[in-house]
């Protein structure tokens, strides 16, 4: 994010204007990770709803560096998912690169948002769920996924990138096996076994 542009937008806000406060609520701002734009890796990070009040609040005190102006076209219920699952998913999609065939391992909150963004970008989405999760597979297909199946069978094509949202470490070698040579595997979950 362009910090100068972000500060300018926030400076134009008035008291009472609506902003969104994401999961990452504050960092030290001086460590190598913060200086490199990788604040999510800061050892002194504080998280909204965990370390900081505000996860389900209508009002809270927040660090302006981590606030986003919410355009009026979004209702609160539409904007809120973008501030947690949406940010995690979008960042993961950016890290995954521009490949055409993207595999999403686990199809929950972040993956269903990424699916829609990737499809909008013209990519093919392959959704992989735990075996027997027909509901999630059906949901992925209803959003437009090219293919949806379980992690046991794997996708029908070689992937350019794989994004793991499921907290199951045993999926890492599977994803590596499903991605083409030189492809990218992104471990996007907050926790993984």
Task: Name every feature range the model reports, one short phrase each.
Residues 72-152:
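Mid-domain Rossmann-like dinucleotide-binding core that forms the NAD(H)/NADP(H) cofactor-binding site
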């Amino acid at each position: 994010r362009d910090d100068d542009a972000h500060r300018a937008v926030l400076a134009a806000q008035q008291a009472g204007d609506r902003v969104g406060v994401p999961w990452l609520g504050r960092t030290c701002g001086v460590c190598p990770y913060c200086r490199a734009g990788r604040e999510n890796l800061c050892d002194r990070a504080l998280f909204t709803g965990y370390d900081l009040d505000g996860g389900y609040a209508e009002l809270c005190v927040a660090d302006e560096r981590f606030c986003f102006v919410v355009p009026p076209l979004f209702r609160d219920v539409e904007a809120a998912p973008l501030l947690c699952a949406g940010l995690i998913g979008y960042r993961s999609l950016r890290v995954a690169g521009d490949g055409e065939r993207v595999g999403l391992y686990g199809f929950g909150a972040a993956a269903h948002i990424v699916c829609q963004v990737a499809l909008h970008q013209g990519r093919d989405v392959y959704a992989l769920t735990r075996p027997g999760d027909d509901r999630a597979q059906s949901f992925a297909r209803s959003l437009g996924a090219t293919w949806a199946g379980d992690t046991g069978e794997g996708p029908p094509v070689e992937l350019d990138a794989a994004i793991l949202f499921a907290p199951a470490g045993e999926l890492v070698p599977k994803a590596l096996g499903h991605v083409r040579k030189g492809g990218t595997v992104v471990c996007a979950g907050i926790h993984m076994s």
